[in-house]
Amino acid sequence: MSFIPHDLGRQGEHTAVTFLIEKGYRILQRNYRHRRNEIDIIALDRRTLCFIEVKTRSSASKGHPLEAVTPEKQKEIIRAATAYLSAYPSPEPDCRFDVIAIIAHDFTNGRIREFKLEHITNAFMT
């Protein structure tokens, strides 16, 4: 069965959310959009507000998922985070930008069955 990249990305985000919850994060929002910018996951890690980008690939043959978080993509995430924070009750919390990279070794029937997940905290700065 062939896969649709959008389905792989959606399953990657679901896998990331499950991972974060197991690590004790509280998920506040998924797929937050501000204009053309999006943040995949917004979560609390204790008292730190985390803006998390998830990149999923079916293999590393087309490059590691982290390579897709380019400086331009980082700027887009920062713009969306700034918009999110403008509506946040003050005082603003400590914030950080994380990236979760997933390589799905087995993606069948629309589900990721085997994968390698890498969570990079403080992956980039403003």
Swiss-Prot record:
PANTHER family: UPF0102 PROTEIN YRAN. Belongs to the UPF0102 family. Disulfide bonds: none annotated. InterPro entries: Restrct_endonuc-II-like (IPR011335), tRNA_endonuc-like_dom_sf (IPR011856), UPF0102_YraN-like (IPR003509). GO terms for molecular function: nucleic acid binding. It comes from the Bacteria. CDD domains: PoNe_Nuclease. Pfam families: UPF0102. Transmembrane segments: none annotated. SUPFAM superfamilies: Restriction endonuclease-like. It comes from Chlorobium phaeobacteroides (strain BS1). This is UPF0102 protein Cphamn1_0017.
